[in-house]
UniProtKB/Swiss-Prot annotation:
It comes from Cellvibrio japonicus (strain Ueda107) (Pseudomonas fluorescens subsp. cellulosa). The keyword Ribosomal protein applies. Disulfide bonds: none annotated. The lineage of its organism: Bacteria, Pseudomonadati, Pseudomonadota, Gammaproteobacteria, Cellvibrionales. InterPro entries: Ribosomal_bL17, Ribosomal_bL17_CS, Ribosomal_bL17_sf. Keywords: Ribonucleoprotein, Ribosomal protein. This is Large ribosomal subunit protein bL17. GO terms for biological process: translation.
Amino acid sequence: MRHRLSGRQLGRNSSHRKAMFRNMSASLVEHELIKTTLPKAKELRRVIEPLITLAKVDSVANRRLANARLQSKSAVGKLFSELGKRYATRPGGYVRILKCGFRAGDKAPMAYVELVDRPARAVETAVEVDAE
């Protein structure tokens, strides 16, 4: 019976699913924007939001918990040094999921997963400086 079971299996066994979300979480922390299928994006939100909440309090114990879930030193470092401070006053909702059409090969619904309040890329603009 299927009582009170939450989460999607995504056609993978548990270890594959765990490794996939570990890799996707580390990529999202490092790049702040990734493209994936819509069901994976919705499940990734359940993984990454508690990690960002954990990063609001920078302690050795919290860093060890985050490292156990991400297993990427650079991602854990960025999580606590940048993202924890960026979202210190936000009470949740750190991830935005934007639908972006369907994949060409199998028509799977695709989505962008991005961190909200991420800094926009610096666009090179020609600014004239008045020389006096």
